[in-house]
């Protein structure tokens, strides 16, 4: 909805941002909080007041009697809260209060291979649900608001439904499930037996026994791909079972009792972390389309996060003490360090490596040293806004790693590479891959040069890192933003 006194295109131009429209023609839904239009109209008409300078606190001040819903974001299998960073930035850029946005880090984010098999490096459904309940209680205490909105990706969506089924529904305003394997990744008595991702498991059978697959009293929304989610496929190729019928269709994430939203062409990760997904999440939470698609810069962003590692090959979100994090500003064209390090810290028991104030348009290198792992040099785009979710894990060695030269890993954390859609170059060489359903978000390259610029082009995004000698147990990780 356009602000009073002008159209939305003019207003967006004033703010320097693009306009994001509806992703589904004719889709109408009642928002959890219809605040956006009223706030923007007031802001735009205030004499002499720059919209860009309004703080999120003023959203509450200008809407007496209305409550800004807290939103808790839950990541998927083997992931971390860091994946929600851009989504949170986009909410903030549309003047949602930072204090009402929180992303949970599941301590052991990877699911057990079988629910009944004890595994200290992975979590069961019961363990993950118990931690989610604790995080919800903590968030409610922090905000002083009884009911909140849950937004979950992948495995997190099923954990949210389990929490709601177990008595948590009274504390939730709405649940938004993005790319959740609602009916499993396979339905089988012979494959993935005991896995929480098997639709024949006791867990999913009981979860889907609820009328419509959802608890009463809580609006539930699903966001899914039309056919490009690797975990909602009729063939078991991505489960290591090519040619085996999974019993799951492209509509696997949908639930009969939910409002089901389908976004064409997006992959499994993009069901939660893409701009298209954000538009739907924001619309559900506020009742309005976001006004800004771009991420607004802060004058002086402050970064922080946690260093974690792996246990028995599975990632954890448990902080590590004694890790060293050095941060350097780098030349965006060469990856060369500019001056001395901007930050140098040894982590304490909680694994926190910050805080660090940065320039919003600078490129940085993070040098991460964790006992037992290669020194990891991480290069990524500038940070336009501050975040407490700039988490770091060291590179996990692979038996196929080279013994000499340099190793470069390119990661797209919030989406898979689509070789039929994306332009990808590493070191000036075009990278191709299998067409069809996007399924990989990590690319590896080797180089004989051990101290050279390594530019990576991903569509319009360009990041240049440096190669490091693997013989010195050093590797390069180039992390894409979008």
Spans of features found by a protein language model:
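A short, amphipathic beta-strand motif
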Residues: 301-313, 405-417, 422
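Structured interaction patches on ligand/partner-binding surfaces of diverse proteins
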Residues: 343-346, 369-402, 462-476
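Short, ordered, surface-exposed loop/turn motifs in non-cytosolic proteins
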Residues: 310-338, 416-436
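Short Pro-Gly-centered beta-turn/loop motif in secreted/extracellular proteins
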Residues: 349-365, 371-372, 439-453, 468-472, ...
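N-terminal secretory signal peptides
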Residues: 1-27, 34-44, 52-53
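Short, acidic Ser/Thr/Gly-rich low-complexity loop/linker segments typical of extracellular
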Residues: 331-352, 463
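Serine-dependent carboxylesterase/thioesterase catalytic core
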Residues: 71-77, 81-82, 86-90, 96-97, ...
């Amino acid at each position: 909805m356009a602000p009073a006194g002008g159209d939305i295109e003019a207003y967006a131009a004033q703010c320097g941002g693009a306009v994001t429209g509806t992703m589904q023609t004719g889709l109408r839904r009642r928002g959890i909080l219809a605040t956006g239009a009223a706030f923007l109209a007031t802001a735009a008409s205030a004499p002499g007041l720059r919209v860009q300078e309004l703080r999120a606190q003023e959203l509450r001040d200008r809407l007496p009697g209305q409550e800004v819903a807290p939103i808790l974001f839950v990541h998927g299998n083997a992931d971390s809260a860091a994946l929600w960073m851009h989504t949170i930035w986009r909410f903030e850029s549309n003047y949602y209060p930072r204090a009402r946005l929180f992303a949970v880090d599941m301590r052991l984010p990877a699911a057990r291979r079988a629910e009944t098999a004890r595994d200290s490096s992975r979590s069961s459904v019961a363990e993950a649900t118990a931690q989610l309940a604790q995080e919800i209680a903590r968030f409610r205490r922090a905000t002083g608001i009884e009911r909140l909105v849950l937004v979950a990706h992948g495995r997190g969506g099923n954990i949210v439904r389990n929490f709601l089924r177990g008595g948590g529904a009274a504390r939730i305003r709405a649940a938004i499930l993005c790319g959740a394997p609602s009916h499993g990744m396979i339905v089988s008595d012979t494959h993935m037996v005991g896995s929480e991702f098997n639709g024949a498991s006791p867990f999913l059978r009981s979860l889907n026994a609820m009328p419509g697959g959802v608890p009463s009293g809580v609006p539930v929304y699903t966001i899914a791909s039309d056919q490009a989610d690797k975990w909602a496929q009729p063939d078991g190729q991505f489960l290591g079972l090519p040619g085996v019928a999974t019993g799951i269709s492209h509509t696997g994430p949908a639930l009969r009792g939910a409002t089901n939203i389908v976004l064409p062409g997006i992959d499994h990760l993009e069901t939660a972390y893409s701009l298209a997904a954000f538009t739907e999440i924001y619309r559900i939470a506020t009742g309005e389309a976001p006004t800004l698609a771009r991420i607004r810069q802060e004058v002086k962003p402050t970064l922080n996060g946690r260093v974690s590692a792996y246990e028995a090959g599975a990632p954890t979100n448990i902080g590590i003490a004694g890790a060293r994090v050095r941060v350097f500003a780098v030349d965006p064209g060469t990856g060369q360090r500019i001056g001395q390090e901007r930050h140098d810290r040894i982590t304490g028991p909680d694994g926190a490596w910050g805080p660090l104030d940065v320039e919003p348009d600078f490129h940085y290198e993070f040098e991460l040293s964790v006992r037992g792992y290669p020194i990891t040099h991480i290069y990524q785009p500038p940070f336009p806004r501050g975040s407490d979710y700039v988490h770091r894990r060291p590179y996990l060695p692979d038996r196929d790693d080279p013994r000499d030269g340099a190793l470069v890993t390119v990661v797209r954390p919030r989406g898979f590479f689509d070789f039929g859609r994306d332009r990808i170059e590493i070191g000036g060489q075009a990278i191709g891959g299998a067409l069809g359903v996007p399924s990989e978000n990590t690319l590896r390259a080797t180089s004989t040069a051990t101290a050279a610029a390594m530019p990576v082009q991903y569509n319009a995004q360009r990041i240049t890192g440096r190669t490091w000698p693997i013989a010195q147990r050093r590797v390069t990780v180039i992390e894409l933003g979008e």
